[in-house]
Amino acid sequence: MLKIKNYVKAESLEQAYELNQKRTACVLGGMVWLKMGNRNIMTAIDLSGLGLDTITETEEAFVIGCMTPLHALETHKELNAYTNGAIRESVRHIVGVQFRNCATVGGSIFGRFGFSDVLTMFLALDT
């Protein structure tokens, strides 16, 4: 069971960084990976209001925010054209669309789960 004592919706990345300096703090995303274990969280830091849920294409790169849902990777036409569909294939077998709408890129990478096709794809892309 996940137990949260204090909830803070960060107003800036700087505030989130400062709050996250304590070991008892935890950054929240889609929360699907956090639910996998028992944990007591003193301060939960919500990043959902910081605009980190987008995929932006520049001349040099694709910029993918940490709060971007996995389903957005699956459906982003330009990103999938660039990777010849590899991004779409790396996420399409992850549970279901509802789950992929909640699970985030940041949580999938930060969790370093051995079963993570997302992490493997980003490693293969040398990101």
Language model features with spans:
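C-terminal structural segment of proteins
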Residues: 1-127
